[in-house]
């Protein structure tokens, strides 16, 4: 914080972060600029992902071809919202879907086991899968029908939302933090009431 006060200029990656800084250090307001994070639109471009890459991804993750794919690309940490997403999925389990939690399989074994048990308790056995990180994230996003970003605490911005939208995939997130700046509700995705399971399920 002291270093922040001594800088000539401060760059925030979102208006959310800007407001947070000003709430704690109003004296930097006049030397603070918002520069939103970007995305490599050559890498995350659906026109640059060939069918072979998609097939390899589908086969590697054994993704069913006849079910909609809900994807949560995030490391396995509690604030990323894996548990609340499982709760929301339990409310729509009468509908066909498979949920891929990309990256969650690399998490701490105790937390991964906890998520698996919790999903089973909710009656979601066989409906969700925790996988390691994938090398070809653009191809993975092409497989998704919708991308979930249910962080239970506000993201400063959230790169996943931009990458998914660049690939033409809608994003469902809670309406707080940087998500309110990167997602156009009803156009490029849906913003649910923060930490509301029913609202997330509806979205």
Identify what each model region corresponds to.
Residues 142-156, 169:
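Acidic donor-binding loop of glycosyltransferase active sites
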Residues 133-134, 140-144, 159:
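Short alpha-helical donor nucleotide-sugar binding micro-motif in glycosyltransferases
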Residues 58-68, 82, 86-129:
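A conserved nucleotide-sugar
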Residues 185-186, 190-197:
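Conserved acidic donor-binding segment of nucleotide-sugar-dependent glycosyltransferases
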Residues 74, 132-133, 149-153:
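Short Ser/Thr-rich beta->loop micro-motif in glycosyltransferases that lines
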Residues 170-173, 183:
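Short hydrophobic beta-strand element within catalytic cores of glycosyltransferases
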Residues 138, 156, 161-166, 180-181, ...:
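Short alpha-helical segment that forms part of, or immediately flanks, the ligand-binding pocket
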Residues 7-34, 39-43:
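A short, active-site helix/loop in glycosyltransferases that binds the activated sugar's phosphate group
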């Amino acid at each position: 914080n002291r270093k922040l006060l001594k800088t000539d200029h401060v760059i925030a990656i979102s208006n959310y972060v800007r407001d947070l800084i000003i709430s704690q250090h109003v004296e930097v307001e006049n030397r603070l600029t918002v520069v939103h994070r970007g995305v490599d639109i050559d890498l995350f471009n659906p026109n640059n992902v060939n069918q072979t890459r998609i097939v390899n991804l589908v086969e590697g993750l054994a993704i069913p071809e006849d079910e909609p794919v809900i994807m949560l690309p995030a490391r396995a940490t509690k604030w990323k919202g894996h548990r609340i997403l499982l709760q929301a999925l339990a409310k729509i389990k009468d509908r066909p879907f498979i949920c891929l939690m990309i990256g969650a399989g690399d998490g701490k074994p105790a937390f991964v086991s906890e998520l698996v048990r919790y999903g089973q308790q909710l009656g979601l056995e066989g409906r969700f899968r925790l996988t390691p990180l994938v090398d070809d994230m653009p191809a993975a996003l092409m497989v998704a029908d919708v991308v979930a970003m249910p962080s239970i605490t506000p993201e400063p911005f959230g790169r996943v939302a931009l990458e998914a939208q660049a690939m033409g995939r809608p994003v469902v997130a809670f309406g707080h933090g940087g998500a309110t700046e990167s997602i156009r509700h009803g156009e490029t995705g849906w913003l649910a009431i923060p930490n509301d399971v029913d609202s997330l399920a509806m979205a």
